[in-house]
C-alpha cells in the first residue's frame, strides 16, 4: 500500500509535469530535446533578420534611385504624347526698357512651352477701357421712381430686356440690371455724390464694348433717368470705350481687351498701363533658372545616392566590413554604381565639339560625389544652353508630322534615317524600308517597332498618314534619357533587377517564416510528448517505489 508519493510540480513552456522521484532532471532533458528541434529555426531567424536588413536597404536604395530618376525625367523629354516635356522646353520672358521704366508695371507675359526663342520691341500707347455711363442725379435711392416700362440693355451682340415697374426705386433698378448682367454684359452700381444725390452707374463687363440702351415698351426708362438724351445719345459718359493700342516691332495693332493672346504665337500679354515714351524689349528664351534648378536637383539626388553607396561599401583600415555595410558585395549595388560611374564620365559630341559634365562646371570630388562651380555653370548656360539641351534630352526631328515617337526604352543609338513607308487604303502600313532594308521594323497596323538588335531597337513610332511617303527622321538619346533608362533596368516595378532582388528576398523571408512556424509547432508537439512521457515515467517510478517500500515493510515485520 502506498501511503504517500513525494513529488514536485515543474512548469516548462506553460505545461506542468511531475519531477523529482526518479532522480532524472527531466526538465533539462526536455529542454535539451526541444532546443535541438528548434536549432534549425534559430538559423532561419538569423537569416530572416539579415534578409530584412537587406530588404530595408533595398527599399532605401530604390527610393534614392527613384528620386534621381525624377530629376532625370525633367531633363530628358519623357516619352508619350501625354507626358511632361523636359525643362528645356520651358520658356521665360525677359523684359527690359530703353529708359528707367519698370516693364512689369506696364505689362505681364506668359510664354507657352517650346515657343520659338526670339525678341520683340513693344510700345504700349493706350489701354483698352470699359464703357461707363451714368444717370442724372436722383434725390433718393430708395423712393419709388414712378417709372413703368421695358428697355433693352447690352454690349456688342449681347442684350437683355429690363422690366421696370412704377413702385421700383433706384436700388431696384440696379438690382434688376445686375440680375441680367451675365446676359447683357453690363453691371450697375449706385454712387452717392452728396448727402441727397445719387447716380446709377452702368459699366460694361468687357473692355472695348460700347453700352447700348433702347426703349422696348412703356416709358423710356433710360431717357427718364437721364442716361440718354432725347436723341438717344449718351448723356452722361464717365469713361469712353477704347481699344488697346500698341506697336510690336513698329507695327501698330489694336485689340478690344488688355489680355492679348493672339498677337504673338505662344505668348499671352496682360497690359497694365500705357507709356508712349518707353520702348520695351520682350525676349523669349529658355528658362535659365528652371534649367539650373533641375541640374542642381540632379546633383543633389546623385550625391544622396552616393552617400548611401559609400555606407554600404565601407571597410576599415584593417579590411573589416562595417556593420552598416549591409549591401557590401551586392550585385545590384555594384551594377548601379558601375552604370552611374560610366554615364557620369561619358562625353557628348554636339556640332563637332566634345563636351562632358565638367564643361558645365559639374565635377567629382575626392569621394566621387558631384560638386558644382556655379559660376562656370551660369556662364555655360547663358552661352550654350542649346548645347546643354542636346547633351541631356532625347531629341527627335521629322520632316513629316504624321510620323511620331510613340515610346522608347533602353539604350538607343543616335542616327538619321529615310523611311520609305507604304500604306494601304485602310491607313495601315504595309511596308517600311531604309535604303532598301525592310528588316529594321516590325509592323502592326500603323505602328512601327524597331527590331531588337538593330540600330533602331527601342524605338516605337506611329504613322498617321494616309498615303505612302518617304519620311526623313533623326534622333539622339542624350545623357539624361540614357541614364534614366539604365536606372529603369534596376528600378522598373515589373522586371527591374532591384525589384526582382527584393522580390526574391521577400519570398525567402516568407518561406523561412513559414518554415520557422512549422519547426516551432513540431518542437511544441515534441515538448508536449516528452512532458507526458516523463510524467508517466515519474508516476510509474513512484508506484514502484511505493511498492518496494511496502514490501520492505512486510519483510521487516516478519523478522
Residue ranges and their predicted role:
Residues 1-49, 70-199, 203-304, 308, ...:
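Bacterial flagellar/type III secretion structural subunits and associated motility module proteins
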Residues 41, 62, 79, 184, ...:
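Secondary-structure transition/capping residues
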Residues 45-76, 299-301, 305-321, 326, ...:
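Contiguous, amphipathic alpha-helical segments that mediate oligomerization or scaffolding
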Residues 59-60, 129-137, 310-313, 542-552:
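Short amphipathic alpha-helical segments with coiled-coil-like heptad repeat character
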Residues 65, 136, 264-265, 316, ...:
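Short amphipathic alpha-helical leader/targeting segments
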Residues 193-198, 311-329, 333, 529, ...:
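Acidic/histidine-enriched alpha-helical segments
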Residues 513, 520, 531, 541-552, ...:
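Long, low-complexity, Ser/Pro/acidic-rich regulatory segments
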Amino acid at each position: 500500500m502506498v501511503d504517500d508519493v513525494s513529488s514536485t510540480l515543474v512548469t516548462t513552456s506553460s505545461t506542468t509535469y511531475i519531477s523529482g522521484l526518479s532522480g532524472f532532471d527531466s526538465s533539462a532533458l526536455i529542454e535539451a530535446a526541444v532546443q535541438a528541434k528548434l536549432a534549425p529555426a534559430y538559423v532561419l531567424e538569423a537569416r530572416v533578420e539579415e534578409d530584412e536588413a537587406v530588404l530595408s536597404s533595398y527599399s532605401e536604395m530604390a527610393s534614392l534611385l527613384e528620386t534621381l530618376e525624377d530629376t532625370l525625367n525633367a531633363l530628358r523629354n519623357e516619352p508619350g504624347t501625354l507626358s511632361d516635356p523636359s525643362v528645356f522646353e520651358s520658356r521665360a520672358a525677359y523684359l527690359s526698357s530703353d529708359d528707367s521704366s519698370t516693364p512689369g508695371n506696364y505689362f505681364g507675359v506668359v510664354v507657352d512651352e517650346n515657343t520659338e526663342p526670339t525678341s520683340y520691341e513693344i510700345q504700349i500707347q493706350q489701354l483698352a477701357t470699359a464703357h461707363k455711363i451714368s444717370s442724372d442725379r436722383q434725390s433718393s435711392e430708395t423712393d419709388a421712381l414712378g417709372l413703368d416700362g421695358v428697355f433693352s440693355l447690352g454690349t456688342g451682340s449681347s442684350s437683355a430686356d429690363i422690366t421696370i415697374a412704377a413702385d421700383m426705386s433706384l436700388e431696384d433698378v440696379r438690382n434688376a440690371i445686375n440680375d441680367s448682367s451675365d446676359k447683357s454684359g453690363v453691371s450697375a452700381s449706385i454712387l452717392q455724390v452728396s448727402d441727397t444725390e445719387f447716380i446709377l452707374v452702368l459699366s460694361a463687363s468687357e473692355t472695348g464694348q460700347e453700352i447700348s440702351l433702347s426703349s422696348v415698351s412703356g416709358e423710356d426708362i433710360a431717357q427718364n433717368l437721364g442716361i440718354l438724351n432725347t436723341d438717344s445719345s449718351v448723356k452722361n459718359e464717365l469713361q469712353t470705350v477704347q481699344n488697346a493700342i500698341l506697336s510690336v516691332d513698329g507695327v501698330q495693332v489694336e485689340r478690344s481687351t488688355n489680355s492679348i493672346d493672339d498677337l504673338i504665337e505662344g505668348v499671352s500679354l496682360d497690359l497694365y498701363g500705357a507709356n508712349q515714351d518707353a520702348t520695351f524689349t520682350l525676349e523669349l528664351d529658355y528658362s535659365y533658372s528652371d534649367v539650373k534648378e533641375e541640374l542642381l536637383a540632379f546633383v543633389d539626388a546623385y550625391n544622396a545616392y552616393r552617400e548611401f553607396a559609400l555606407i554600404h561599401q565601407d571597410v576599415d583600415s584593417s579590411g573589416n566590413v562595417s556593420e552598416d555595410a549591409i549591401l557590401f558585395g551586392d550585385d545590384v549595388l555594384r551594377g548601379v554604381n558601375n552604370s552611374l560611374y560610366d554615364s557620369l564620365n561619358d562625353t557628348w559630341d554636339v556640332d563637332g565639339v566634345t563636351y562632358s559634365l565638367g564643361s558645365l562646371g559639374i565635377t567629382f570630388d575626392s569621394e566621387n560625389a558631384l560638386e558644382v562651380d556655379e559660376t562656370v555653370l551660369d556662364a555655360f548656360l547663358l552661352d550654350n544652353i542649346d548645347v546643354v539641351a542636346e547633351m541631356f534630352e532625347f531629341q527627335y526631328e521629322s520632316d513629316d508630322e504624321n510620323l511620331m515617337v510613340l515610346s522608347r526604352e533602353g539604350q538607343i543609338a543616335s542616327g538619321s534615317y529615310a523611311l520609305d513607308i507604304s500604306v494601304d487604303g485602310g491607313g495601315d502600313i504595309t511596308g517600311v524600308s531604309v535604303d532598301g532594308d525592310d528588316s529594321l521594323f516590325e509592323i502592326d497596323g500603323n505602328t512601327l517597332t524597331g527590331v531588337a538588335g538593330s540600330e533602331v531597337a527601342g524605338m516605337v513610332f506611329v504613322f498617321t498618314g494616309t498615303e505612302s511617303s518617304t519620311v526623313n527622321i533623326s534622333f539622339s538619346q542624350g545623357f539624361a534619357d540614357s541614364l534614366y533608362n539604365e536606372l529603369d533596368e534596376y528600378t522598373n516595378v515589373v522586371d527591374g533587377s532591384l525589384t526582382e532582388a527584393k522580390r526574391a528576398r521577400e519570398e525567402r523571408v516568407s518561406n523561412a517564416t513559414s518554415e520557422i512556424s512549422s519547426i516551432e509547432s513540431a518542437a511544441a508537439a515534441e515538448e508536449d510528448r516528452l512532458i507526458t512521457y516523463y510524467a508517466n515515467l515519474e508516476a510509474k517510478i513512484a508506484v514502484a517505489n511505493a511498492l518496494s517500500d511496502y514490501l520492505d515493510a512486510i519483510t521487516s515485520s516478519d523478522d
